[in-house]
């Protein structure tokens, strides 16, 4: 079934039909254990039967161009952005197809934090950068859907309408009033839900540190 789902995902839109992406499939227990530290040892890496690492990949296209006497100017940030978009479209198309077949998936954003370690673990060559990891398996049950902001929070008509304090209050009201989120605030000894995100989960110091790591990765992999 995995190849069938990947075939469906490969029909996703992409930049110039160049398909500047690739995916590394990890099933082997030892290889999953090698990946786990890069994902802060989150248990789904070793517990899931399949781990997929979706990559921005200009390597394959550049090698094809070289073999056909074409000069590909793809060692730049623009190509990294294009290939990142391609990889994410491929990944999301896969996830949609997988869930339609009754599979469970989990996105792992830790891929971007420790891209350097994942590059080593997966032997990724120049012009290939891991973007997102997805674990796949059959769920034990059907979990409740995680809350989302109302559509009005993300949709703008004709032009972008900036948010006022009143509109922010209205858009985040239901999210802040959920008991699970109130518990989240209490457990982290914070005053507001926003503080949990800014002071605990996604701190300025961590954002800056991992930004430096990713910039070094892009330079090392030939995109900067």
What are these regions (language model features)?
Residues 1-224:
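Acidic, surface-exposed loops and disordered segments
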């Amino acid at each position: 079934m995995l190849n069938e789902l990947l075939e469906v995902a490969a029909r996703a839109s992409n930049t110039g039909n160049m398909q500047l992406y690739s995916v590394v499939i990890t099933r082997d227990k030892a290889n999953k254990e090698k990946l786990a530290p890069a994902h802060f040892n989150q248990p789904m890496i070793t517990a899931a039967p399949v781990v997929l690492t979706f990559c921005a990949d200009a390597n394959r296209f550049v090698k094809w161009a070289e073999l056909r006497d074409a000069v590909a100017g793809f060692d730049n940030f623009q190509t990294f952005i294009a290939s990142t978009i391609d990889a994410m479209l491929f990944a999301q198309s896969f996830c949609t197809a997988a869930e339609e077949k009754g599979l469970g998936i989990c996105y792992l954003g830790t891929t971007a934090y420790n891209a350097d370690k994942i590059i080593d673990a997966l032997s990724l060559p120049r012009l290939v950068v891991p973007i997102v990891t997805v674990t796949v398996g059959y769920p034990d049950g059907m979990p409740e859907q995680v809350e989302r902001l109302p559509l009005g929070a993300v949709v703008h008509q004709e032009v972008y309408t900036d948010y006022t304090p009143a509109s922010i209050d209205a858009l985040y009201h239901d999210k802040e009033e959920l008991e699970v989120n109130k518990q989240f605030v209490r457990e982290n000894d914070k005053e507001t839900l926003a503080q949990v995100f800014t002071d605990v989960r996604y701190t300025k110091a961590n954002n800056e540190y991992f930004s430096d790591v990713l910039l070094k990765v892009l330079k090392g992999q030939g995109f900067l």
